Amino acid sequence: MLKGRNLLDPMDFSLEELEGVFKLADEIIESPEKFLHVCDGKILATLFYEPSTRTRFSFEAAMLRLGGQVIGFSEPNSSSVAKGESVADTIRTVGCYADIAAMRHPKEGAPAIAAMYSEIPVINAGDGSHQHPTQTLTDLLTIRSLKGDLSNLTIGCCGDLKFGRTVHSLVKALSRYKNNKFVFMSPEELKIPDYIRKEILEKNNIEYKEVSKMEDAMAELDILYMTRVQRERFFNEDDYVRLKDSYILDGEKMKYAKKDMMVLHPLPRVNEIAYEIDQDPRGCYFKQAKYGMYVRMALIAKLLGVR
């Protein structure tokens, strides 16, 4: 049972619990009309201390499609945070009004602090460059639905691997499934963090390699996970400008890829995926966005104990 639990890290749920979420998402996709009222009378609080379009809209759409309601803020200046209120006090107050909360915060660990003081389930909707577990659930459901399995895959991660919280969460999650291998493609300044390399991959004897050119790895990939270079993570604008166009996926590079490779992206994109790829059936990132709403519907229903 996931009722009353928090989701702060993709490792919080066992593989069996994750599969339960995915199976419920499958049911929702198959028969959404059966779930129109399962959250009647329930309220989701969206506490977004950082800008977001897709994640926030996805959570809100998920709750509304379950029959629930949504309260919250989309940037801290519109809340008591601007007056200096702590995360602990905010979540305790919000818990008086809502049944479940989704929090995005620029500081790593902020949702975990909120969960310590909260009497309602807290979902980490992204904390700094640390974790983004509901994006990971989205990614896993997309791969599972389109590939049929989450094992025996070669996954390429490309772009900003240092600050990209979606990559960190995805590598941790897919490392739990059998016989997965990773290929990391990034500029030297944006390489995968040591803690992922040492504590997740090497500690568990998971095969990985790092390459400097996308073309060197494309032919072996089952999944290509693209990310943007995030301007908001840079203190120096010159560094951002120098690195932002480091890796761009276009039709020429796709010629090296398998016919059934999947291209995923957590969105928003800037220019790291050429628009011509949108017409390629291997470009699955907009399907991925839709799966995100369904998996959040399933997660909310599970944490509230209504399914």
From Swiss-Prot:
Carbamoyl phosphate binds at residues 54-55, 104, 132, 135, 267-268. It is an enzyme of class 2 (transferase). Catalyzes the condensation of carbamoyl phosphate and aspartate to form carbamoyl aspartate and inorganic phosphate, the committed step in the de novo pyrimidine nucleotide biosynthesis pathway. InterPro entries: Asp/Orn_carbamoyltranf_P-bd, Asp/Orn_carbamoylTrfase, Asp/Orn_carbamoylTrfase_sf, Asp_carbamoyltransf, Asp_carbamoyltransf_Asp/Orn-bd. Belongs to the aspartate/ornithine carbamoyltransferase superfamily. ATCase family. HAMAP family: Asp_carb_tr. The keyword Transferase applies. One of its GO terms (biological process) is amino acid metabolic process. It catalyses: carbamoyl phosphate + L-aspartate = N-carbamoyl-L-aspartate + phosphate + H(+). It comes from Clostridium botulinum (strain Loch Maree / Type A3). L-aspartate binds at residues 83, 165, 228. NCBIfam families: asp_carb_tr, PRK00856.1. Heterododecamer (2C3:3R2) of six catalytic PyrB chains organized as two trimers (C3), and six regulatory PyrI chains organized as three dimers (R2). Keywords: Pyrimidine biosynthesis, Transferase. The keyword Transferase applies. Pfam families: OTCace (PF00185), OTCace_N (PF02729). One of its GO terms (molecular function) is amino acid binding. It comes from the Bacteria. This is Aspartate carbamoyltransferase catalytic subunit. Pathway: Pyrimidine metabolism; UMP biosynthesis via de novo pathway; (S)-dihydroorotate from bicarbonate: step 2/3. Its EC number is 2.1.3.2.
